[in-house]
From Swiss-Prot:
This is SEC14 cytosolic factor. Required for transport of secretory proteins from the Golgi complex. Catalyzes the transfer of phosphatidylinositol and phosphatidylcholine between membranes in vitro. Keywords: Golgi apparatus, Membrane, Protein transport, Transport. The keyword DNA-binding does not apply. InterPro entries: CRAL-TRIO_dom, CRAL-TRIO_dom_sf, CRAL/TRIO_N_dom, CRAL/TRIO_N_dom_sf, PI/PC_transfer. It comes from Eremothecium gossypii (strain ATCC 10895 / CBS 109.51 / FGSC 9923 / NRRL Y-1056). SUPFAM superfamilies: CRAL/TRIO domain (SSF52087), CRAL/TRIO N-terminal domain (SSF46938).
Length: 308
């Protein structure tokens, strides 16, 4: 594996002009001062890894550029990473049951949106926890989530940044609620709650766009009630759509990158792993793969389910 410095030097370090304030390349003098102060206090505290501009600015944005709060968040994250063996997760964790799990809870990446973000799709409405928990456990599902976040950071984003010719820091998420039932939603709530906790606390500011499609009647109205209590920047990233969502998705995702099942033109053969397992994107294209190498997979194509 390349050093952290070698990897950072291999892809663009600035976001596109006009990107969110507080992102690399879009800083005020106050932002720059907070960035340098945070880096200084973390170095003084003995931290040596993940002190690059992009990482520290994500923690600062998550805490409204309050240096003390961002420092506490960063330190908690590093403690969590050590306790969970995150730095060696690619060597230590193998999710051989994923091809089977995907049938009952489809979660996958597929190409990029118009801003170069990896597109992440989760079909929550298709979840079948009863069958899934015959194959795996919630603990292993959450471990796989961490594995995917690390792959996103170490492999998907560098390759996506090279393709976009600017720093890409976030994902474009599609959450498909088609067929969701109250009972299914209640079943998966525990996992979703834990997954959200991991994302918010340890991988902050990774959401670029978030589309909920096939949202049940009344979902949008309920969201409008909560909007006043949410951060305006977060609200601007979230789109609640019913069954007529294709036009809105195609504004953000090129037709050739959007799967056919969602109104696009991208089709994947079963020989390639199908939509759920093919993991197609710039992270699979030699043109955009750098010193980090091609993104690994946590499973083989002919799996034997691994016990917990």
């Amino acid at each position: 594996m390349p050093t952290e410095e070698e990897l950072l030097a291999s892809y663009p370090s600035k976001c596109a002009a006009g990107s969110l304030a507080g992102t690399p390349g879009n800083l005020t003098s106050e932002h720059e001062a907070a960035l340098e102060e945070l880096r200084k206090v973390l170095k003084q505290a003995g931290f040596t890894k993940r002190l690059d501009d992009s990482t520290l600015l994500r923690f600062l944005r998550a805490r409204k550029f309050d240096v003390a709060a961002a420092r506490a968040m960063f330190e908690n994250c590093e403690k969590w990473r050590k306790e969970n063996g995150v730095d060696t997760i690619f060597e230590d964790f193998h999710y051989e049951e994923k091809p089977l799990v995907a049938k009952f809870y489809p979660q996958y990446y597929h190409k990029t949106d118009k801003d170069g973000r990896p597109v992440y799709i989760e079909e929550l409405g298709a979840v079948n926890l009863t069958e899934m928990y015959k194959i795996t456990t919630q603990e292993r599902m959450l471990k796989n989530l961490i594995w995917e976040y690390e792959s996103f950071s170490r492999y998907r984003l560098p390759a996506s940044s090279r393709q976009a010719d600017c720093l890409v820091e976030t994902s474009c998420t599609i959450l498909d609620l088609k067929g969701i039932s109250i009972s299914a939603a209640a079943q998966v709530l525990s996992y979703v709650r834990e997954a959200s906790n991991i994302g918010q606390n340890y991988y902050p500011e990774r959401m670029g766009k978030f589309y909920m499609i096939n949202a049940p009647f009344g979902f949008s109205a309920a969201f409008r009630l909560f909007k006043p209590f949410l951060d305006p920047v977060t609200v601007s990233k979230i789109f609640i759509l019913g069954s007529s969502y294709q036009k809105e998705l195609l504004k953000q995702i090129p037709a050739e990158n959007l799967p056919v099942k969602f109104g696009g033109q991208s089709d994947v053969s079963e020989a390639e792993g199908g939509l759920y397992l093919s993991d197609i994107g710039p992270w699979r294209n030699p043109k955009y793969i750098g010193p980090e190498g091609e993104a690994p997979k946590a499973f083989s194509m002919s799996p034997k389910p691994e016990s917990a």
